[in-house]
């Protein structure tokens, strides 16, 4: 697991993700034509109360992967 630093609108964020999740997080940002900071900020707004952002990012990536597999 590696800690990554992001920024958006003057705010700094850090997130620790395994290499595979980081790669998929970057792919999500690319697919949505967003910076990593924009994607993090967008996900932060929808993070369930009591959840961590790391968990929310992993869950979002997992749900996206499942949806794509079902659509294929």
PLM regions with names:
Residues 20-38, 42-45:
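Surface-exposed, Lys/Arg-rich phosphate-binding patches that contact polyanionic backbones
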């Amino acid at each position: 697991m590696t800690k990554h630093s992001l920024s958006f609108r003057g705010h700094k964020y850090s997130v620790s993700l395994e290499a595979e999740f980081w790669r998929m997080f970057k792919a999500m940002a690319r697919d949505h034509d967003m910076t990593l900071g924009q994607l993090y900020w967008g996900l932060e707004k929808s993070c369930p109360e009591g959840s961590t952002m790391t968990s929310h990012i992993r869950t979002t990536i997992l749900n996206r992967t499942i949806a794509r597999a079902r659509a294929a």
